[in-house]
Amino acid sequence: MANILKKIYDNDRRELKKFEKLATKVESLGDEYEKLSDEQLQAKTPEFRKRLKNGETLDDILPEAFATAREGAKRVLGLYPFRVQIIGGIALHYGNIAEMMTGEGKTLTATLPVYLNALTGKGVHVVTVNEYLSSRDESEMGQLYKWLGLSVGLNLNSMSADEKRDAYNCDVTYSTNSELGFDYLRDNMVVYKDQMVQRPLNYAIIDEVDSILIDEARTPLIISGQAEQANSEYIRADRFVKTLVEDKSDDDVDDDEDHGDYKIDWPTKTINLTNQGIKKACEHFGLKNLYDIDNQVLVHHIDQALRANYIMLKDIDYVVQNGEVMIVDSFTGRVMEGRRYSDGLHQAIEAKEGVKIQEESKTQATITYQNFFRMYKKLAGMTGTAKTEEEEFREIYNMEVITIPTNRPIARKDLPDILYPTLDSKFEAVVKEIKERHAKGQPVLVGTVAIESSERLSQMLNQAGIPHAVLNAKNHAKEAEIIMNAGQRGAVTIATNMAGRGTDIKLGPGVKELGGLAVIGTERHESRRIDNQLRGRSGRQGDPGVTRFYLSLEDDLMKRFGGDRVKLFLDRISDNDDDKVIESRMITKQVESAQKRVEGNNYDTRKQTLQYDDVMRTQREIIYGERMQVISEDKSLKPVLMPMIKRTIDHQIDMYTQGDKKDWRNDQIRDFISSAITDEETTKKLNMKHLSAEELKKRLYQIAEDNYAEKEKQLADPEQMLEFEKVVILRVVDERWTDHIDAMDQLRQSISLRGYGQLNPLVEYQESGYRMFEEMISNIEFDATRLFMKAQIRQNISR
């Protein structure tokens, strides 16, 4: 362990040395650039762009570009980045995390790598945790970029698609993390390419990177829509299906006649309408062609009603309890609480059983921040606290944490923790300390872990007659204002879990002489990082300050991980002695080792989440890639559709022609051909009994080719044909992908229940997920084949 730590430390030093050399180069250009006129300095931007076009790299022009942005900042913002800020900027350019203490000017530091990377014209995203900070930074720092000839955009939740597109087309775009993620998902749901708003993800600098990539890492972004099927549709389909008769005739009976309306193939648990059944459906619903493109939703309902009524067996596959359909686990025979079949099958069973059909919202697209931000070509981040999570940043995001030295030595005093036996005695002591410091005018910031603690403390301060402000993360703009005033003489501010990150606490007049800002933590958070954030609010830029944590044996963390040694202290304190107090570095160490254990557990959970998510990520990339190919195509999708049709023919014919010819499942073959490839008349003329499986496939390929040619003739305009092809593929892909997301979610929930025996749940999930994905692709190809081959051509199709 010691060796690993030494290696990390040495690597940190080595990187820092390299960055310091570069910073010296940047500083050495300072005098020369100071002498340039505004016009000459502004002319640097087109000059750099030209040099990049001619083959120079960003690394080649870094010293000059940084010197340009630095001099520009002095002229436009009245701020001149210090040497440590240049080093921080270099760390960011190389895709690292710059750990910079609060008040060291992270926002200004970012301007240097943002300017350099924006010169490529491929876009730089500056990512913040809320829209207030995005707007603030865009209006303040944006002045500098605009002055240097770059375009700057702000991406807000309230904007229209056109406004968003304009923002993303800028050289520099300010946005929140959630808006970036949702825009990415929405872009992969559009049906026309010009509806997309984002460009390829190039370079992002994330402010408060630990908050976004670690605290919110497991939060999935989800776009969901009400499942569009109305309940009445399930009932309509159910009523129709209940009138049908099963065709139980043997496949050996070769009379080309249907002996019922539907046929079940029990080995594969598939069920299909026969030609007789298709005719009945057309009569029942008043249709000319059941498989026309407009009837896709109805066909889906009929398919599910058939499965619900004739394949899914009551008291074997499911039970009905208290008016609800409950799934039975085929492995254990137990009822699975809260689980539902996906793809509308559950509603179809509810219709069959005459119970209330439950509305369902459907996840249409989803991604986690972990997977979204890993798609950027280059990623960097800034925060005051990342070192404790260094391993996670390296392993998951391939980013090193570089601790940037402070501009001035730290003068803050971090006092040892104080431990009280009870919550009451602890809060009384906190109020006493606030009172003493407030009496002499020293500003106090009190950090609490939970809102209820802040309310309790606020009540006690009211009783003590101490005016104070309470902060919780509801109103970001108001929050910033309160935090800005927290360093004024006599200010007392209570903040929950570091609301107000990203806003500096500057000391008011005469506060330095009083000892700077006093920070009091009312309990330790389970993450050291959050505690360090609270501490870091005091002592900015070499200011004086003091911090201390007050703990009690009734605190959550102490109860969970207090350790035996702390309990010994408790025994020494008699029951009635509430005033007994322990102040010791040992307590601090004990708490920190408890925090390390929690952090380790949390990291393992996030890592596991990512391993599961990676299965979905691979699948999402394939589907989104295919979708993009479809909406970007400007000539013909025949090279995509025709192979789909051929693979469907191969798959279906292979499935039903195994073994000797006498074992062929002729009824199923006929049903497939007449429902998905051609009409009943042509199916009869095929004379299958004289064909081998390969000959039959070739005949069907030819029918498909002829059908394609016929449709191309009907739609003489190639653009209309392309539009028709796109409609077919997009409708099918989107419907099947949405169902697949749902099914994968169900699988993930059930997989933990399967973790019996020696099975590894993750391996089970990967293998089942892969099989389900293959099945989905096969279903997409089947649906696209049926939809394309059976559709009637009309002029006014819409996607």
From Swiss-Prot:
One of its GO terms (cellular component) is plasma membrane. It is found in: Cell membrane; Cytoplasm. The keyword Protein transport applies. Part of the Sec protein translocase complex. Interacts with the SecYEG preprotein conducting channel. Has a central role in coupling the hydrolysis of ATP to the transfer of proteins into and across the cell membrane, serving as an ATP-driven molecular motor driving the stepwise translocation of polypeptide chains across the membrane. Belongs to the SecA family. Monomer and homodimer. Part of the essential Sec protein translocation apparatus which comprises SecA, SecYEG and auxiliary proteins SecDF. Other proteins may also be involved. HAMAP family: SecA. This is Protein translocase subunit SecA 1. It comes from Lactobacillus johnsonii (strain CNCM I-12250 / La1 / NCC 533).
